């Protein structure tokens, strides 16, 4: 971030009136923990609760945050405000206690909006690519010495955290469309990476309602704000005529994009490309340490934002080239060994068919000669049901497949939308022979039967499969150079 030998003056944000102690219900979540960390570093007394300990709760405790395991009414006794995520039920004992004592209960996004209120907010929305794009923007602004505050849905590897209080007026944050809570935010710059049918229970199954919600989000921009939009995406193109704010576009395929990538080449995990920019600005030759067309688009959004903010071209290129990635976003662990084979282990958070397809494509680009074996954990029964045929099609494109059962995220089971059903449908398609994982403790032995020497093993999904990847890494990985 900023030069430690010459630190900037810390940007002063007015305090929230009458608020001293802030309690988070579900503090271990990626979005909640980041906001809690920023508020703690702003000087507030922060507490929180979660159902289990984790690396996140341990980190918060090390920051002197009071973290309780289990939800109990007395946890909120000292709270002046209680922050909840959309996953927290109204009958949660801490929520009930706060309501009885007339303590304000606010959604996570409303607290993020309060943090953003007095800052120069940059919000990144979209079905896919939010975390990586937010991280890239934060890294480039940091490389330029602008020392932003950031709140990200994954761990920024270079910072070792998913949130950080910066010394400047800049705030970069993800904008969550899953529950439409991004409508609370009032940024100065809004990025829309793409729009796809996901979390459709929030939108009553109506794609038009989903698209209009993105329009409403962009109209939260002030008249001097700007929307940065990917015109390679069909739904994004459809809503552009409805937007009454300044718009900057980017893309690869659309020749009318303001920022356009050309001459894209891959070299292992590196991607190089040329960026055409509007207004007579010189082209940029860019290098990323990440494979995949989707990451080129994420970088284009970053370049558009940074250029509009007046960031020096060299700082843009340095920030992109030096970007060390985000936890669980095509995270290369190293070499995983079984008694008979050695495979490269990659872990990725993607859990939508488009995201899984992008990971497979990126892996093919980076390692074109290797077999791809995927260990996949579906996430949510509703998503599996709504996108069932897309999952069957995409998961049939790997060379070996192990399927875990659905990570429910609190949803009730839906007949015909589980891991076994997916396994049957993929087998009937006839392109790959899937193996259903009956018991997660059997994963290592199943992998020993499936993996061949030189394979690429990808652990994929948004549930607890990240813990499986870490377990495999600890048990059988020789660290990468």
Curated annotation (Swiss-Prot):
Cellular location(s): Cytoplasm
SUPFAM superfamilies: MurCD N-terminal domain (SSF51984), MurD-like peptide ligases, catalytic domain (SSF53623), MurD-like peptide ligases, peptide-binding domain (SSF53244)
Source taxon at top rank: Bacteria
Major location category of this protein: cytoplasm
InterPro entries attached to this UniProt entry: Mur-like_cat_sf, Mur_ligase_C, Mur_ligase_C_dom_sf, Mur_ligase_cen, Mur_ligase_N, MurCDEF_pg_biosynth, UDP-N-AcMur_Ala_ligase_MurC
Catalytic activity: UDP-N-acetyl-alpha-D-muramate + L-alanine + ATP = UDP-N-acetyl-alpha-D-muramoyl-L-alanine + ADP + phosphate + H(+)
EC number from the UniProt entry: 6.3.2.8
Pathway, per record: Cell wall biogenesis; peptidoglycan biosynthesis
Signal sequence residues: none
Top EC category: ligase
GO CC annotations on file: cytoplasm
GO molecular function: ATP binding; UDP-N-acetylmuramate-L-alanine ligase activity
Gene3D superfamilies, per the entry: Mur ligase, C-terminal domain, Mur-like, catalytic domain, NAD(P)-binding Rossmann-like Domain
Record function comment: Cell wall formation.
NCBIfam families: murC
Designated name of the protein: UDP-N-acetylmuramate--L-alanine ligase
Organism for this UniProt entry: Marinobacter nauticus (strain ATCC 700491 / DSM 11845 / VT8)
Gene transcribed to yield this protein: murC
